[in-house]
């Protein structure tokens, strides 16, 4: 028997780290009833067998992915699938009236040629893709409120774009000088076994990867171009660090007005995000740490100016699995449903 008045929700791809974050958060959401978990490799297994620590709370099993069945049982569907799979079922889910939030890259791009170039997947759902709204609430809250399909941002783009947006929107920097130096914890690599994520490989080490070819680069550039009003190219370099959760994106760019100081930028950022409950701008001289955000849906931002070089330095930290993935998707759902944007989401981290 369902909970009267609660919205029935399903998750496809519940067995990964993003999926289990969705399960955990949605189980505590006061307006949601989780009624369906779907997947491929884990079909028939109880969710508790995959995550025993949630056995007392989650009694569902992993079912086959059948969009007809999903649509009959769910009003809202979260898709936490590998890239290239969501686009195979989203058109049917939309046709059946479901609201869909896709956590893969399939619906983040306005230009599907760009998607195909970077992800190697040919698409036949251009009409559907044209209806998708990019799910960064701090920039596109009004569009999200009217959306049926949301393409949720990647974790690196979330941290990077929240750092860059005030600078680009207000024309404070030379856009082509923007450099994003980002570090992520190992959970960003997913739950499947990978050599580079083994403790013996990742511990006591810091490693750059996918230099000049990371797939989040065109996603960052797309939104930067939107904000600047012209095409922008960004230098983006990711690094793996030996922590489980967290992203730190440090952004460098040349200021148009070399007379601006750190206090000026802090005031500008505070005003820009005054209506964004999940972004906290640090006081001048305070620089954020990944531990502050771990376990929460918050983004902490610190801003500084180097008068010697005329550059601004912006530091942005998030939990890659919450604000960078599951939490932000639920934030978008809250907006789509007309609920409080903070409903059901963790407001404080695990600290220490």
From Swiss-Prot:
Pathway as given in its UniProt record: Amino-acid biosynthesis; L-arginine biosynthesis; N(2)-acetyl-L-ornithine from L-glutamate: step 3/4
UniProt cross-references to InterPro entries, sorted A to Z: AGPR_type-1, NAD(P)-bd_dom_sf, NAGSA_dehydrogenase, Semialdehyde_DH_NAD-bd
Top-rank taxon, per record: Bacteria
Family annotation (Gene3D superfamilies): Dihydrodipicolinate Reductase, domain 2, NAD(P)-binding Rossmann-like Domain
Organism listed in the record: Nostoc sp. (strain PCC 7120 / SAG 25.82 / UTEX 2576)
GO cellular component, one term: cytoplasm
Localisation per UniProt entry: Cytoplasm
Function: Catalyzes the NADPH-dependent reduction of N-acetyl-5-glutamyl phosphate to yield N-acetyl-L-glutamate 5-semialdehyde.
Any one GO molecular function term: N-acetyl-gamma-glutamyl-phosphate reductase activity
Protein's name in the database: N-acetyl-gamma-glutamyl-phosphate reductase 1
CDD domains to which the protein is assigned, alphabetical: AGPR_1_C, AGPR_1_N
HAMAP family: ArgC_type1
GO-annotated biological processes: L-arginine biosynthetic process
Entry's EC annotation: 1.2.1.38
Family affiliation: Belongs to the NAGSA dehydrogenase family. Type 1 subfamily.
Gene name of the record: argC1
Annotated keywords: Amino-acid biosynthesis, Arginine biosynthesis, Cytoplasm, NADP, Oxidoreductase
